């Protein structure tokens, strides 16, 4: 739900543009702190928007928006994706599709360009879900294709309420509505279906990425249910560190190690870490169920 990483491993969603002088910026919804884009992301998006305007007429581009970890002020230069939504006035035609494929191929020559994940969504489809939409152009790991990508209530809520405007109409002003109850229902599905099923597959948690994904995603879900806003993976992990009992402290420190210092020695054996992760996941699932 929050992250595309777990799906990829197993193959297994309103901020004003306060100052043009910063090119783009955002707000930490918890603290009300303004964030400028990291320099390398700003440079990438400047190049992207210049080339995008060579493909689409100005009137076809409603806006380009950044969401995800960057908009939440939690960008990690080595690992963070550049999550974006480009809203256009109508569908992409065949010639434009080919030009977008070439654009992303060119941008993926850079390390950050390879981590662009996004969608080209017609204005009339804003707020809809994949089963209500025709196929659209999307970008995954810097490669453009046609099909369906990462759309759910969380996508739309973060775009509308926390999205950073790169160009065009302000994110908070784009014409669609998303209800908080829809976000909660997405969380509920994620907990009751996705993670409940993963908890039945304990072998998954011998893989480091699954340990990290399970813990930080459940931390984000729990924070969201408690505080009615979306936060980064880092904040989700910090929330668990602040509220969990001592019996989980070593596991949480191990997840922090995976995220921050992956080359350092493990704090737990693979067997113990996998067992603790599954038990903690089940504990967090029950905690979330008390909040529906």
Where does each model-flagged region fall?
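Positively charged N-terminal leader segments that act as targeting/secretion signals
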Residues: 5-22
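Conserved nucleotidyltransferase catalytic core and NTase-mimicking acidic/glycine-rich helix/loop elements
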Residues: 158-292
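Soluble or luminal CAZymes and related metallo-dependent hydrolases
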Residues: 40, 44, 99, 272, ...
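Helical scaffold of the NTase/Pol beta-like nucleotidyltransferase catalytic core
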Residues: 28-64, 95-96, 292
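Catalytic metal-binding acidic patch
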Residues: 66-104, 113-122
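Glycine- and acidic
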Residues: 30-35, 86, 262-267
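Conserved NTP/Mg2+-binding pocket subregion across the NTase superfamily
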Residues: 31-34, 97, 102-208, 212-215, ...
